[in-house]
Amino acid sequence: MTTTTLTAPFRFDVVGSLLRPASLKKAHEQLAAGTITRDQELEIQHTEIKRVVAEQVKLGLKAVTDGEFSRSWWHLDFLWGLTGVGKYDYHQSYKFKGDHTRTDNAELIGKVAYNPDHPFFAAFEYLQSIVPAGVLAKQTIPSPTMLFRDNRSDNWTKFYDSWDAYLNDLAQAYHDTIQHFYDLGCCYIQLDDTTWAFLISKLNDPEADHAAYTKWATDAVKVINAALADLPSDLTVTTHICRGNFKSTYLFSGSYDVVAPYLGQLNYDGLFLEYDNERAGGFEALDQIWNHDDHKRIVLGLVTSKFPELEKTTVIKERVQAATTKVPLRNLALSTQCGFASTEEGNQLTEAQQWAKLALVIGTAKEIWPEA
């Protein structure tokens, strides 16, 4: 966690994923079919990353991502790259409202550890090499809590004598991975996390085992904070609390109230929170989430990335003003509610509409914070 003056998250910021161009989707299909080589696919990938980085810089973003073009899933590709984690067919779609996903999943195949050859390191090095001076290369990875979910840790007893021993290894693997990103020159990392929205749904369900999910929340705080402990002081680490994002559909609904006490304990420099519609509830929980940490920024995701219609600037400004009853304006920032393509399928809007959404975020933020 940084100890210097707030920089990132910026007053206007990008969550991470961008719509995959047709050329990249085709290249992925050809690679899977064996009709092009990995080097040929990588050349197309780099060309498209260079293009979207230039577009982000042109828009005026102070931190840019590679659009997550080097991965198919926002979370699984990273998890598969850790030592002790393997890929398998779950034979079930993730339960999005109104659509079905591919059935890939991750599972423990050994003790979890940092992998010095994780493919995300090479992807970051390419991004870093093309980002101009004065702009940060932002790296997104899934939260360690994503290994708790969807049967991914079911066989932990094969490799560990206790659940706590597993959590300790998981935290260390993440800590070492984040440290290596920093050693490669990364100063801005974001941990994306749907677990909190999952817990919102469970803790609001009168038939759910609340004691079990409360323990889950406590473990999540423990692992995340252990992963963040003793990292360099000039490294910014944020999180994005996601409710699911697949072809413009979602997984979870509910206000942040039931998880706010836990979110307030997390030692992040900033939290990106989805607030694009009534499913997210109101701003009442912001006071607990921010937890009166003058160093921390709450990034309000008031602009949807799921649909092309542009929000009205006046409405966005009114909502930011409403949030100041819980968090000072100096500790707030603005973004889209999520990325545009958490999986390579992408949301139901065009690339031009995607850039228009980001331009709206930037323009509105500059009106709210003239110094932005």
What residue spans do the PLM features occupy?
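Domain-level signal for soluble alpha/beta catalytic cores
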Residues: 1-372
